[in-house]
Design a protein with these regions (language model features):
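Long, low-complexity, Lys/Arg-enriched
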Residues: 1-80, 89-118
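Conserved TIR/SEFIR loop-to-helix hotspot centered on a Trp-containing motif
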Residues: 86
Length: 118
């Protein structure tokens, strides 16, 4: 399986979705874009790295921070992405950072049938 990159931020019940996503599939590596609260309070497995960013900064600054934190980590030409948790601004910043890195994107989610590409 490829690397997974997901937002871990706001939204009622979204942490449960992200946790299920991590446990339902075997990923090579998992990067969760979160804030300090998420880094301190979300339980992860050994393949997961929590990348804490300042979610309150402007869109371009957030994009640049995410880009900086991911640029030396992604090893493949394609990544799986989940955007269930977080805000539109966080999603735009993550997508822009990934496109700036030049990687392909597969949107994935947990459905009633398990983890699927959507």
């Amino acid at each position: 399986m490829p690397e997974l990159i997901a937002c871990l931020s706001t939204g009622k019940g979204t942490w449960g979705h992200v946790a299920r996503l991590l446990s339902d599939n075997t990923w090579d590596k998992i990067y969760l874009i979160t804030n300090d609260y998420g880094k301190e309070n979300f339980t992860v497995n050994p393949k997961t790295e929590l990348l804490s960013v300042n979610m309150s900064q402007g869109l371009k600054e957030l994009r640049d921070e995410i880009h900086e934190k991911l640029k030396d980590k992604i090893k493949d030409t394609e990544v799986a992405v989940n955007l269930v948790s977080g805000t539109g601004k966080e999603h735009m910043a993550l997508m822009s950072a990934l496109l700036k890195l030049g990687v392909g994107i597969r949107l994935i989610a947990v459905t009633k049938d398990g983890v699927e590409v959507i």
